[in-house]
Amino acid sequence: MLRTHLAGELRPDNIGDEVTLTGWVGRRRDHGGVIFIDLRDRSGVAQVVFRESEVAERAHDLRSEYCLKVTGVVEARPEGSENPNLASGGIEVNVSALEVLNEAAALPFQIDDPSTSGEVGEETRLKYRYLDLRRKTQGDALRLRSRVNQAARGVLAEHDFTEIETPTLTRSTPEGARDFLVPARLRPGTFYALPQSPQLFKQLLMVAGMERYYQIARCYRDEDFRADRQPEFTQLDVEMSFVDQEDVISLAEEILVAIWKEIGYEISTPIPRMTYADAMKYYGSDKPDLRFDIQITECTDFFKNTTFRVFQNEYVGAVVMEGGADQPRRQLDAWQEWAKQRGAKGLAYILVGEDGELSGPVAKNITDEERAGIAEHVGAKPGDCIFFAAGETKPSRALLGAARGEIANKLGLIKEGDWAFTWVVDAPLFEPAADATASGDVALGHSAWTAVHHAFTSPKPEYLDNFDENPGEALAYAYDIVCNGNEIGGGSIRIHQPDVQERVFKVMGITEEEAREKFGFLLDAFAFGAPPHGGIAFGWDRIVSLLGGFDSIRDVIAFPKSGGGVDPLTDAPGEISAAQRKESGIDFKPKKGPQGQKEK
């Protein structure tokens, strides 16, 4: 090794030791010919001092991010110059030998200056990601990710799981998003697809008798770029045979407990559960943030005989903003703009005065009986503001769900370090295909119905006999885990019987011929004694970003794409040469037969 110690691990116990350190020049200070440098390596920082004339003279030429090797004796810092913010802040190294391992060009941004970290644009940070990762916060994010990987692997090893890699080059199968396609040079005109998930292969592994599988899997989805999405991402993928929902949830909770321990937090188990129906009814979201106690109150029946036309609708609901009655008019107007940005016409409101009197546009338009009872109905007290949404049920609840989050932020109800987990169970098995398309997903199949999760999710046992007769009523044998309003994992008990799988395909409008073409290998496998099985996949990037307190998953990915799906570092995606196009067969056109049909 080129060094004897790590810079950040030196302590007063090392005083008197001769050490050799390696690292990069951070802050540099020149005090009357004595040069002080913060030398940084992966462990942290140590102050090294150049006092001797020869090395001090050479140290004058050192600049930020020069890569150095220094040898010297560990000494106590002079009294009063200790740095309590550094683990090594009680010592310094008096350098006797200096070797410049490599010089550094002028920096595009400062590495060690926290005051400039927010001023550097993300495109610049990603273009020079290898410099960005020298920053402690960014480097620590990847080290945290590594520890989380190890913690999860430890739990799975204790339960006798086998880590298995599934193919990255496979065939295109409809799974809810667009595939990334790779031309097959040896079979011109044909393409591999990068997997959107290991779903089909892990089910095949259950048929193969592996029983307990996991993988930290790379997944790829060619979807429109939304906020904080990546075209390639990572999930912890787990599958088990001969299990029910309780078995999978129990294991998943063990994994979550282990990885949250990495940041010193103890998750209380069993984690609470709520049904999908309750999540939508009370929180307006299938991933409710439970760090604050604000719920939606349905008012549809309360206003069933109203004369107020706005509330003569399919659904009326409300959320209460405690102390919100004293908001100035400009703030109430800002709420209207906020709602319009989310596709609503506005956000109706009632202000409850300190004397209990109601005011605001809604209060003037409802009946005396409605005015007398609305505050009690929604749980509003004097000084509160009641916000309403009316219209179609789903978008109205979604608006109120977003409003409860906005209220929590404005009132400071979310405290740093708070964690709230819940399982959301009993989601619908199918949803209208139009709803899936409207939300930006790809609706599988060709009927009015598509799968909410994926086409291989089993109906709950009580719906097995009639799910295809009433698709809108059937519930999925599925479970999602939510943390602080983020879905961090989801899974289900899978279909393992060929006839059930074929019935699901039929509901979705996937013909028998299409099913054989796309999923024939899976259907064939089911014919050979496929066991009951189920599993879960955790969104690994999201989990690590939550653990590290990052706003974006890009901060916990070594070399992420920008918001537009571009890699500023390598400038990918890029064009390919004419020779590459020809060699890959990407422009291959099948010959046509006598009747103009493509030859096979």
Swiss-Prot record:
Give the signal peptide range: none
CDD domains, alphabetized? AspRS_core, EcAspRS_like_N
Region entry Aspartate, spans: 199-202
Taxonomically, the superkingdom here is: Bacteria
Q: Name one GO cellular component term.
A: cytoplasm
* Alphabetical list of SUPFAM superfamilies matching this protein: Class II aaRS and biotin synthetases (SSF55681), GAD domain-like (SSF55261), Nucleic acid-binding proteins (SSF50249)
Identify the enzyme class: ligase
Query: Can you list the disulfide-bonded cysteine pairs?
Result: none
What is the official name of this protein in its record?
Aspartate--tRNA(Asp/Asn) ligase
Gene that this sequence comes from: aspS
